[in-house]
From Swiss-Prot:
Residues 1-20 form the signal peptide. This is Aspartic protease pepA. Monomer. It is found in: Secreted. The active site is at D98, D279. It comes from Arthroderma otae (strain ATCC MYA-4605 / CBS 113480). It comes from the Eukaryota. The keyword Ubl conjugation does not apply. Disulfide bonds join C315-C348. Keywords: Aspartyl protease, Disulfide bond, Glycoprotein, Hydrolase, Protease, Secreted, Signal, Virulence, Zymogen. Its EC number is 3.4.23.-. One of its GO terms (molecular function) is aspartic-type endopeptidase activity. Glycans are attached at N257. Belongs to the peptidase A1 family.
Amino acid sequence: MVLINQLGAVLAVCATLTVAAPTKGKARFNVPQVAIPKKMVHHPAVSYARALHKFGMKVPKTVQDAAKGSVPTTPTPSDEQYVTQVTVGEGKLNLDLDTGSGDLQGHNLYKPTSNSKRLNGYSWQISYGDMSSAGGDVFLDTVSIGDVTASSQAVESAKKVSDQFAKDKATDGLMGLSFSVLNTVQPKPQTTFLDTVLSQLEKPLFTCTLKHGEPGSYDFGYIDDAKHSGEITYTQVDNSEGWWGFTADSYSIGGPNTTSFRGDSSGMANGGSISGIADTGTTLMLLSDDVVGEYYGQVQGATNDQQQGGYIFPCDAQLPDFTLSIGGYNAVVPGKFMNYQEIDGSMCFGGLQSSGSSGGPNIFGDVFLKSQFVVWDTQGPRIGFAPQA
């Protein structure tokens, strides 16, 4: 870890909103994402390690070792992170909107102003599976996104940061859109951005339209019917632990009518249901060993490579589609989305990896979410899916 004064800056992130600014009527607004440089400076196993650690799963030594490596060739462009501009105090930060976090955390310049207020005795600390970490003090400041402003936001100002965070120039941090129970500010957790601004929104929901290979967008307070085709299928959310958790009735590899379809003809669970967490802050999709092994068993040349820290395959391999059946709706992830990143000129790292042998949670990250139009509705709560228009 490097003390922040040695870096010549105060790194920060916004964690939680406690007071929403008054508004006339109800707000609805669109927030476009910002394109970030596509050239990656770390091994793809870093994304894998961070995802495992984020959800309390053991990070195998092989993954840790691979995450410390580098990619010697210019990699194929990948959708590692999606960022959105958020005004924090007097500055603008490019943040990853993260439904798997209750904080707003980051690693870019933050300067408390005369309007900022330190929360004495409050602190924060985060770490990830690739050994990156940051921590520091908490201030109250103004945070705005779109047409909504929180006038008293808990801003996590970093006093120390590891080299991994200091070298990450692609994004400035993350804004949590989970339920407030996940907030990590101590000694008293704060409300999330989403929970704070709900009263300002026309409807207590937001949607995301993540894209493959290009920026997408978030809409707050309304559903833009021009962004999806067909009806939206909803399913109940389990938020008992703060996550946007849901259960898919069944899955299939190669299509819902293939022999690997798990479930009966009605689409109801028959030993093939998959419960997991929808998380825009996780790049990959993580499923159980048997499902992942079954998928790559249909990919010629695929192998679980210990040196690379996960499943890899020839970059020109034909990858089958992966389908989740949710309330009678088939959410299809095109096979090409499963090709996450080139690692050595001929082999590629998979966008689907194992959630571990210890029974860790399944994670429906961006590899899955960018194939769908998704509604995150706090009433219920529930989550909805439809094909993107």
